């Protein structure tokens, strides 16, 4: 089954089965973990999701760890890819953020995941995804999810996400003072033809031959693209 989905999520921790670099994860299902909000997305650089109105919030991804003998796994992830739709089921590999992002982007994404409390409302969940998209796709000097217009800008207007947009900007404003905790890092669930996701691991992800580690997963999962009479998903 193919879902046009924009993965969106806010930080939420779980204890998940072991994963490692080069681990293959097969995702078979997803849902919003704490609800969602919607808004009109703008990307000055264009792309398939420019001027679309998805719902966004933290996603709960479930599936199996293929490398570990199809052990059941659960991740909470955020979308970091607005160029691909999410296909479920779909296979992903665990990769470093450097595969897609600059050192500054990777650091800020990790700070965001490590310092924002687990969401308990739809606004908190949506705010986390918006802040993640701002880091990933806004290349302007000012990070503000509510304004834009220069090349590389990302911003959001209208919809039910007004509170989430304000909250997202408060997260972004704290990036200069937040730090990355020792022993934790963010990683990608990556597929070049599928929609890549980001999650946070409380301890370093070991090499492929090392098992038995528990991680804390964070994430965004696909958002429901909504038009008034037609719904379709991005993720």
Residue ranges with predicted function:
Residues 222-235:
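C-terminal membrane-anchoring or membrane-association module
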């Amino acid at each position: 089954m193919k879902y046009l989905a924009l993965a969106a999520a806010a930080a939420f921790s779980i204890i998940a089965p072991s994963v490692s670099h080069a681990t293959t994860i097969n995702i078979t299902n997803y849902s919003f973990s704490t609800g969602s909000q919607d808004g009109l997305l703008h990307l000055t650089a264009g792309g398939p999701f420019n001027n679309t109105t998805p719902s966004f919030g933290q996603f709960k991804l479930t599936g199996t760890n293929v490398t570990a003998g199809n052990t059941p796994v659960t991740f909470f992830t955020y979308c970091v890819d607005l160029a691909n739709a999410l296909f479920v089921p779909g296979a992903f590999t665990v990769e470093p953020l450097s595969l897609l992002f600059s050192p500054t982007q990777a650091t800020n994404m990790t700070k965001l995941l490590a310092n924002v409390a687990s969401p308990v409302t739809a606004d908190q969940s949506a705010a986390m995804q918006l802040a993640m998209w701002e880091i990933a796709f806004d290349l302007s000097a000012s990070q503000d999810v509510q304004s834009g217009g220069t090349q590389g800008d990302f911003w959001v207007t209208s919809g039910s996400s007004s509170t989430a947009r304000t909250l997202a900007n408060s997260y972004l404003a704290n990036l200069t003072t937040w730090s990355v905790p020792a022993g934790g890092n963010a990683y990608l669930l990556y597929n070049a033809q599928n929609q890549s996701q980001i999650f946070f691991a409380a301890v370093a992800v070991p090499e492929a031959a090392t098992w038995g580690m528990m991680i804390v997963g964070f994430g965004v999962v696909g958002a429901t693209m909504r038009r008034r009479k037609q719904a379709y998903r991005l993720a």
